[in-house]
Structures are given as structure tokens and as C-alpha cells.
């Protein structure tokens, strides 16, 4: 029975996508809505059953559906593997996705492409479920590329907008960079392990760690190379510093898409992969150190950019980038359990933030927070939802973020990583930009046009009611994970799914009380600072002058996002364009001129010349015959004479 339920969890979103996608011209909005929401809700309920069976009772489900690849000794089956890690991911993905589907019925109600939109959302969910339930690297890669394709389709959903098309292409290309490294990592593993199955590869991890090769006079293990390549793939998918540039542009898609991408699907795939491959990464301390550094830098880097953004969705997008940095920092210090714990809690409160922001945008048709204000009385439910999501993000007790984020920072402190300081600084900035949104959108004097402000109201129930589930998740997921499942401990819920060779250090090291309370304390300080900065009109006008000042180089750097786009444009885009122009000129002026076009011109020229001999006069043709006879006789006479 449980095997059938497990299969249904994955196939129901696929069925929804196929029904709505293939019959998009024949199916009406109402029927499409019923199919999408009922199938996804059923999948979410089944995920609870599997969580009880596998997550709580520890019964692992391994289903071999059908043979896929068989070449000599290399064999890969199409399988479903569900352990504690997969079952908790099922909960996060299906429940957030079902809420997003229901919310979309109201948000996209006036859009002619709603059936196509629901189809893409369901397909996105299917690929993510396939990714987390794979038992081998090739099947994981299938899901990995699937979520990438769906993100392209959803970010560019409004394809008549040029900015949406450019954002979709940017996201697709940026992820291709990471995916290229990911493919090389998988190829390396298959080449040396002669298998793509997790079980076989993980057993060979110690051997791979001891297999050394010389690379530019530097001895490095095969495992280090494979893990580094896999992590670069994760950097692209999870928008870590360097490959993060696609994330803010992804806001061009409809807001429900942003919620699904940032909360439970695409960007969390990288964190999941590192956790799933903990059996490899634990034997590669060099790569773990690199992951810690990248995660720590990203969480502070993205939070600093979020401070200076004015677009409500982009602030939350950079918040996602920052929180993913926390998750990778946890994985880097071998606290994979804390990273996944934060992934799950983050899924609920980040989806709540995005969908609440969507309600605001739906009401006022504006995304610039400096043009809003005084909406708390017009939209009290949305205000309450956004406040709960923000406090959970900041890490205020007893909301979910308090337990999961503190777990990460305690692990970083216990491991002696300097990135702990980066995490604390990012926590302060998180509180400040969260309060920036709340104060400018819901408090103060309105800066909206009078007509827009007067007509601002709560969204319909189909948009508001589903958020109750996310509010509950933002409240209770942290408590359940901490008190009931012990997700913060390496020997807790995930002890059979994740490997931690240094678990004893985390178990015997107990950070002092002030370290445990420090994240919440700095969060409260950030809240106070944020309220002070964005409540006072005097301070606000000063901040606006600083942001617009041409002499304030620090704010210019933050507003321009550390000039990553400009840097890539200068180092990559422009040289490629110059090279393309050079090749284009060579193609047009040399290859085409002397190749196909030159040959065609020669034939045309010859045909024109021969055409001139066709005069239509008999005496001309007689002359040609006489000339031919004279030339022929002369030639033979010359041959005889010689």
C-alpha cells in the first residue's frame, strides 16, 4: 500500500500537468482549477502518510519501477527511494505547492493563460519530487534539468514582455554554467565508480578519497574533484555568490512562481543534493571548507544588497539567497541536519512572505515599496501574515526560524568557523530589511495615488485562506522539528539519512547561553534599528538622499548589487559579442563571398554570357558552326604536325 501511495505522490502532479497541458485548448478554467488543486492536495495528503510511515517509523521505501540503462556492467533503474530526508522534502514540496496552486486561482484569475500556468506549476512540482526521490545520479539529473526547464517556462510565462523573456534566458544560461560542472561531476563519479547508484557510490567514497591524481603539480583526490564539481552545480541552482545573478531577474514571473521557486523547489535542490551526498562530502574536508566560506559570504552579501532594494519581490528574493547561504554554511560544517531543518521551516515562511507580497501587488498594482504605505488598515490579514513571516525569517521566538537558524549558527560556532560572525551580521541585516518592508508598506503615510489607496482591499478568500497553512507552518514547523523530531541534532531525525563523521563534536560541544540567544538578540536590535530608520520622515528623507547621492560610493555599490551584472557584461558578454561579430564578418565576407554565394555568382555570370550567344538569328548560328569546324580542323592539323 505504501509503495502505491509513494508512486501516487509523484504521478499526481504529472497527471495534472499532462491533463491541463495537453487539453489546454479544450479544457476550461474551472475544470483545470479543479484538476490542479485536487491532484496536488491529494499528493500533499499522501505525503503525510509517507512521512508517518518512513519519517516517523523509519521504514525506508525503495521501489524499482523499470530498467532504464544497461550497458555491459553499467546498470541504472528508474526507481523511487524514500528515506527520512526524502519524506520531509515531500512534505515541504507538496504542501507549499498545493497552497501556491490554490492561491494562483485568485491571483491569475483574469489571465488568459491560467490553464497553461497551472500545467507548468504541476510539472515543476513533479520534477522536484522526482529529484528528491531518485536513487541514482542520472535520475536526479533528470529532475535537476526538469526544474531548470520549468523555471525558464514560468519566469518567462508572460512572454509578450521583453523583460520576462530576457530574465528567463538569463536564468537558463546562468544555470547552464553550474549544470555543466554538475554533469562533469556525475561523469567523474560514474567513470571511477562504474555506477550511478547512490548506494554503490557512497560505499566507494573512502576509496575515492584515497585515489590521488596530479593536477597542475598539485595532488588532489578524485573525490575532491567530484564534490567540487557537484557543488558548483549547486551554486548555480541555489543562487550562491557568483552564480546568483539570475535570482532577482526571476521576479519577472508571476508572484506564485516566485513563491514556488524560492520556497520549496528549484533553489532548494542544491542544498538537498549536498545533504543527500553527505556520504561523499564528509570525506572531502577541503570542499566542505569551501562550501562553508561560500555559504557564509553569500548570506551576508545577499542581505546587504536586500537593504538597498526598493522592489518588494526583489528584497524577498535576496532574502532567499541569504537564507540559502545559511543552509550551505550548515552543510559546510557538517551540520546537514540543521541545513535541511532550516530548508523546511524556510519553505513555509518564505512562501508566506512571497504570497503576502503578491496580495499587496494584486491590490495596489505596484512593487516599489517607497510608493506604498498605510496599508495595515486596508489589508489587516495580509499585514498579519507578512508580520508573522517576517518575524519567522528574523528568528524571533517561538516562530520556526528561531529554532532552525539558531541551530545553524550554534553548529558554526561549535565548529570554530569564522563564518559564524558573517551569520550574525546577516541576521542583523535580515531584521532591518524585513522591517523596511513592513514600515514602508503597511505603516506611515500612504504614497499611493488617492484612487488606488481608496480601492485597496484584501484579496479574495481563495488567495487568503490557503495562507493559513503557511502561517501554521511558520509557527509550528520549528517546534515540531526541534522538540519532537530533534532535527537540530545529528543523531536525531536524520541519523539514518545523513552522514556526519564529526557528529560527536557537535554532541559534546554545548555553546554558552549567550551564544544561543545571540541570534535572537541581534534580530531584536535589527528590528529596533529598522523601525527607527524607516518610521521617521527626517531619517527617511536622509536615507533617500544617500541612496540618490552620486558621491556615496558604498550605497552605489549596494544599489548596483556589487556590479556583478556589469562585471559579467564586461568580461563575458561583450567579448563574446565581439567574437560573434568577428565570426559573422568572416562568415559573410569570406565564407559566403567565396563559397556558396561566390559559386552562385559565377554560375549566374556564366549563364548570362552564354545567354548572349542565343540571338535567334540563323547567320549567327552558322558562324558558330563554321568557327567550331575551323578550330577543330586546326587542332587536329596541329596534332599531326607535332
UniProtKB/Swiss-Prot annotation:
GO biological process: ATP synthesis coupled electron transport; electron transport coupled proton transport
Membrane topology: Multi-pass membrane protein
Compartments in which it is found: Cell membrane
EC number, UniProt record: 7.1.1.-
Catalysed conversion reaction: a quinone + NADH + 5 H(+)(in) = a quinol + NAD(+) + 4 H(+)(out)
Keyword terms of this UniProt record: Cell membrane, Membrane, NAD, Quinone, Translocase, Transmembrane, Transmembrane helix
Transmembrane regions listed in the UniProt entry: 4-24, 31-51, 88-108, 114-134, 137-157, 171-191, 213-233, 255-275, 287-307, 315-335, 340-360, 383-403, 418-438, 467-487, 513-533, 622-642
GO CC field: plasma membrane
Pfam families: Proton_antipo_M, Proton_antipo_N
Function per UniProt: NDH-1 shuttles electrons from NADH, via FMN and iron-sulfur (Fe-S) centers, to quinones in the respiratory chain. Couples the redox reaction to proton translocation (for every two electrons transferred, four hydrogen ions are translocated across the cytoplasmic membrane), and thus conserves the redox energy in a proton gradient.
Family that this chain belongs to: Belongs to the complex I subunit 5 family.
Protein name per UniProt: NADH-quinone oxidoreductase subunit L
Species of provenance: Rickettsia bellii (strain RML369-C)
Gene it is expressed from: nuoL
